[in-house]
Structures are given as C-alpha cells and as structure tokens.
C-alpha cells in the first residue's frame, strides 16, 4: 500500500475522468487532527473566527469544510486539481486517488481518448441502426424498442454521411479485406447493396436485447460480470463447431477465422464507445481501475463481457457496415456468418446467458450523476 503525504502529486478520479492533483492536507484513519502542507497539525473542526487561519486565509471562503462524521476512522486527502480553480479543492477517500506512475498515466489517457471518441462518434452519427441509437440517445428508446420487437429483421438505416471515417472503415473492413474479389465497386453499386443490407436476427435473441434494455435502463441493474462464458469463449465454441462443418474447405476456414478474429477486435475497440448504456460506464471504469480489464496485460474486454454485449454488437452491424467500402460478396459472406453465429447462440442461450444484479446505492448515485 502506497503512503501518500502532503505536497505529493497523484492521479485522482473526478467524475468519469482522471486528473493530476496535489495533496494539500491529509487525515490518517483514527487521528483526531489534520496534517497540513507544512506538516503541522490542525484541528478537525474549525473554531469559528479562529485566528490560526494563516496563509490559506485568502481563499478561506472556498475551503471545502472537513466533515468529521463522513470521514470518521477513514484516511482522507484534501486535493487541489492541477490547473483548476481552488474552489474545486475537495476531500476525497483513498479509492479516488492513484499513484503517479506510467500505468496510471495509461489509464488517464485511455479515459481521455474514450471521451473524445464518444463526442466524435456522436457528432459523426456513425451509428445509424435503430438499436444502436438506443445506446447513444435516450430520446428514441421507447420508440425504437417497439420497432425492435416488432420486426425480426434489422435493416440498416443508411444515413451516415461519414464515408471517409477511416477508423470505422478499417475496423469493419479488416474482417474480410483480403477476401474481397473486387474492391473497385462503384459507390452507386455499394449504395444499392447497402440498401439491401439485412441481418436476420432471431426473435428470441431480440427478446434478450429488449429485456437487457429494460433491466438496465428501467430497473437499473447490471449484467453480472465477469461472465462465466465470456465472448472469447463463445467465439471459440463457435469456431470449433464451424470447423467441423468446413473440414474440407481451407479457404472458407481461413475466412471464418478472419471474421471471428475481426469480430473480437471490433468488440474490444467499440465496447466503451458505442455498446454500453450510460448506466454501465461506471462499471467499465471500475474494471479499468481494478485491472480487471487491462489491454496492456492482454486482459481484454472480450474476456470479461458476455453474450448480451456481443448481441448488441451483432444487431448494430448493418448500421456500422453502412460506412464500409467492402464489396457485396464480402459483405454477404460476413452477414451470413453472423446469422449462423446468431443461430448457434440461440441454441445455447441457457448456457451463455448471464444474470443481472442490483447495484449498490453508491454506484447508483454516481452512475446517474
């Protein structure tokens, strides 16, 4: 356990992001005093009009009052966020601060990236599929839900005006890039293909997603994670099952492997950007914080999340693929493989489904703020 002292620089969580901060004061566990920047002891409760307010007097109106009841028997730290106005200085518990080192710097940068990308993605309206809109704006939830349950076929709404979105493109094309027989398709032709881009999504899986939406947004529950059958396991099971069917065809086999590898990479990259409901963001951040997910150590999102989150990605694919440059042949190979994967999952729902659990009051108030 690291011991923190006044004047030390640390990383601190404030809302969903991590900032650089300096410890101005601290109170250790059961101590009956506060240690300030000069390593002097201060009383826990300020006496009214105390003359001992020395050099902090000029912003005394900003000083966050120390709350003895709240911090009883707990170690806590009075932080100043670097570059912020001192009115944001606050007392925080040990769970909010982290050592100032490379690994935590990586976490900080990843969260900064997520927030930027989230804004970029919202602006670009890449997500055009009704179901995915569900995850990004709350207005259409009820409406798209009705739509979701009424038809068993998801059709992309081809409205994304971002054909030049490289990242999005490369993620979705990489899955079948070298299977493209003819990548010089004219954009007109591809528009026709896209208007017919249908994914037959079995009604029983749609039902899972409707319930999933209800549990999280209405009942404020979370999928119980890490999943017993995480996504990489499901894809592995499916690969084994499909390999038996394709034994004689090495070309099809290599396409299958490419699609499944691409799907897993795509999931890991897109989870925090487009596949989580707002209420789940904090759960994801906690996984990062506790190293339950740590891409640097090869502990990936697909090792933790399960079938519900995989289905959210699959049902979004027509919308995501509407910005791709894949030709019609590759697209139809990809779509039919995804449909086959859906049927496979449908037959094994009892095995793969996860439970939902209520969150703690702390989680609930933080996640909704």
From Swiss-Prot:
Compositionally biased spans, kind Low complexity: 126-135, 150-191
Localization in the cell: Nucleus
Keywords associated with the record: Chromatin regulator, DNA damage, DNA repair, Nucleus, Transcription, Transcription regulation
InterPro entries: Chromo-like_dom_sf, MRG, MRG_C_sf, MRG_dom, MSL3_chromo-like
Membrane-traversing stretches: none
Keyword Cell cycle: no
Domain of life the protein comes from: Eukaryota
Domain named MRG: residues: 193-368
Pfam families: MRG (PF05712), MSL3_chromo-like (PF22732)
Stretches for region Disordered: 43-66, 126-191
Protein's UniProt name: Chromatin modification-related protein EAF3
GO biological process: one example: nucleosome disassembly
Annotated source species: Candida albicans (strain SC5314 / ATCC MYA-2876)
Domain Tudor-knot: 9-97
Family in the record: Belongs to the MRG family.
Role, per record: Involved in deacetylation of histones, chromatin assembly and chromosome segregation. May act as a transcriptional oscillator, directing histone deacetylases to specific chromosomal domains. Component of the NuA4 histone acetyltransferase complex which is involved in transcriptional activation of selected genes principally by acetylation of nucleosomal histone H4 and H2A. The NuA4 complex is also involved in DNA repair.
PANTHER family associated with the record: MORTALITY FACTOR 4-LIKE PROTEIN (PTHR10880), MSL COMPLEX SUBUNIT 3 (PTHR10880:SF15)
GO terms for cellular component: NuA4 histone acetyltransferase complex; nucleosome disassembly/reassembly complex; Rpd3S complex
């Amino acid at each position: 356990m690291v011991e923190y002292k006044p004047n030390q620089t640390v990383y601190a969580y404030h809302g969903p992001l991590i900032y650089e901060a300096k410890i101005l004061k601290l109170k250790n566990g059961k101590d009956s005093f506060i240690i300030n920047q000069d390593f002097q002891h201060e009383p826990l409760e300020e006496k009214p009009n105390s003359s001992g307010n020395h050099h902090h007097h000029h912003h005394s109106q900003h000083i966050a009052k120390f709350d003895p009841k709240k911090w009883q028997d707990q170690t806590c730290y009075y932080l100043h966020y670097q570059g912020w106005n001192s009115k944001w200085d606050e007392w925080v518990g040990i769970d909010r601060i982290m050592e100032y080192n490379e690994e935590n710097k990586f976490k900080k940068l990843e969260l900064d990236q997520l927030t930027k990308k989230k804004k970029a993605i919202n602006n670009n309206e890449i997500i055009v599929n009704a179901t995915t809109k569900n995850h990004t704006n709350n207005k259409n939830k009820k409406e798209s839900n009705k739509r979701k349950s009424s038809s068993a076929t998801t059709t992309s709404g081809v409205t994304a005006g971002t054909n030049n979105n490289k990242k999005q493109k490369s993620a979705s094309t990489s899955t079948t890039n070298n299977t493209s027989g003819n990548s010089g398709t004219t954009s007109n032709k591809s528009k026709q293909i896209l208007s017919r881009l249908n994914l037959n999504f079995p009604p029983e899986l749609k039902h899972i997603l409707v319930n999933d939406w209800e549990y999280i947004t209405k009942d404020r529950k979370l999928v119980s994670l890490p999943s017993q059958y995480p996504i990489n396991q499901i894809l592995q099971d499916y690969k084994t099952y499909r390999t038996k069917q394709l034994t004689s065809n090495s070309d099809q086999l290599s396409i299958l492997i490419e699609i499944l590898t691409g799907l897993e990479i795509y999931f890991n990259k897109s989870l925090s950007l487009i596949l989580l409901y707002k209420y789940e963001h904090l759960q994801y951040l906690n996984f990062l914080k506790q190293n339950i997910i740590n891409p640097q150590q090869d502990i990936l999102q697909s090792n933790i999340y399960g079938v519900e989150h995989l289905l959210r990605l699959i049902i979004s694919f027509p919308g995501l693929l509407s910005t791709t440059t894949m030709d019609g042949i590759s697209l139809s190979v990809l779509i039919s493989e995804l449909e086959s994967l859906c049927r496979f999952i449908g037959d094994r729902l009892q095995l793969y489904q996860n439970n939902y659990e209520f969150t703690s009051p702390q989680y609930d108030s933080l996640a909704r703020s």
